[in-house]
């Protein structure tokens, strides 16, 4: 017997094993942040785990206050949820030696040299874009380690984005299995 009261839910299409083009960006060591813009209004500010608000106990390293103080710039981002990393002075030991706190957008398809973000908002660096291989990821990590030594900062690692799968994975120099598992390099 067929139940006509149940709504059909299709099984998702499974992509082929060929991963195709990837984008590797630098993983910044800060705190995850997001600004939500709807109807030309900032309707939300959040961290990775919670909504934020201006105030000592409701903010996250001053990100909500920064958004409040710079609303016009953040509204220039347009509609949507704009995820990124809030990093710099006073956050995670400031391993990039930034002179102040900065917000770096993750979406390199939307933002970058081809479409610069508003002044005072940054974009994570694209380190590689092309075909996927383990060797490419390893070479990119090694290159980042060398270039960061020359620039005088300590990198956290890379994020590999698979556009075909709309998925990401992170590769870190320390705690490759997760920082809560102790020393597991």
What would you call each of these model-derived segments?
Residues 1-185:
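Core nucleotide-handling region used for phosphoryl-transfer chemistry
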């Amino acid at each position: 017997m067929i139940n006509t009261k149940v709504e059909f839910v299709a099984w998702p299409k499974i992509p082929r094993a060929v991963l195709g083009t990837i984008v590797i960006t630098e993983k910044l060591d800060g705190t995850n942040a997001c600004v939500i813009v709807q109807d030309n209004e900032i309707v939300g500010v959040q961290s990775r785990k919670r909504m934020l608000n201006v105030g000592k106990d409701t903010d996250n390293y001053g990100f909500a206050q920064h958004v409040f103080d710079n609303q016009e710039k953040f509204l220039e981002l347009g509609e949507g949820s704009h995820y990124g990393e809030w990093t710099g002075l006073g956050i995670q030991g400031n391993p990039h030696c930034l002179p102040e706190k900065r917000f770096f957008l993750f979406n390199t398809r939307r933002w970058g040299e081809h479409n610069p973000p508003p002044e005072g908002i940054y974009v994570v660096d694209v380190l590689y874009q092309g075909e996927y291989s383990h060797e490419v990821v390893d070479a990119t990590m090694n290159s980042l380690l060398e270039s960061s030594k020359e620039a005088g900062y300590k990198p956290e690692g890379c994020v590999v984005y698979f556009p075909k799968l709309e998925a990401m994975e992170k590769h870190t120099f320390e705690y490759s299995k997760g920082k809560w598992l102790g020393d597991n390099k």
